[in-house]
Amino acid sequence: MARWVEMPIFSPVYENVAETALRNGNARLENAFITEAKTHSRFPGLKTWLRMPSPGKVYLFDWRGDLIAVTSFGLVYRIGSDKTANNVTLTPVSGGRRVTAARTQDEILFAAGGPIVRLIGAKTELLSKDAPIATHVGYVDGYVLANEAGSGRFQYTDAGVYTSWDPLNVFTAESKDDPLTALVVTPFNETILAGPSS
């Protein structure tokens, strides 16, 4: 079962990283830190929980008490609390980009630069042949939003009907003349769209 775990960022084990360590190169939060001697040290207590059956990067999403793992090869797995990874791929997630997901009341949707794929029931399937080729997908108050890959436009579905993509249900973000490369829906149902220059 998926669950959030508080990470004690302000505890002593995390406080000994010098600020200069972050100025000496790129940094990101993982299961390691840079010591005062500028070496890497792994946090204690972390261990492998499950090895995925297929190689590649894995993107995790929580869905109805399970973890959903999507690999960079497009395979989708449902991971139960008993450490089993069941392949639920009928239609792979394609596009070759980082996988994004949106949760509706009944399904979870995936986009990665190709057609939008949904997991509803036991297997994945194509959301709609009319849906845009998208790198990002989001859900707000009964509407599914998706950017049109390589453009400044995004489309939305009819309310509550996620397979219905009317060609007139489109907006253009024209504050900057660049393609939309990000779509985020905040916990307050605000939609943020961004591109490389905006």
Predicted regions and their residues:
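A broadly used, surface-exposed interaction patch
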Residues: R78-E107
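Short coil/turn segments at the loop-to-beta-strand junctions that recur within blades
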Residues: P55, L90-R97, D130-A134
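Short linear motifs in intrinsically disordered
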Residues: K57-Y59, G65-I68, R98-T100, Q105-F110
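N-terminal beta-propeller domains
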Residues: M1-T84, I133-S198
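Beta-propeller fold detector
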Residues: N86-T91, E125-D130, W165-N169
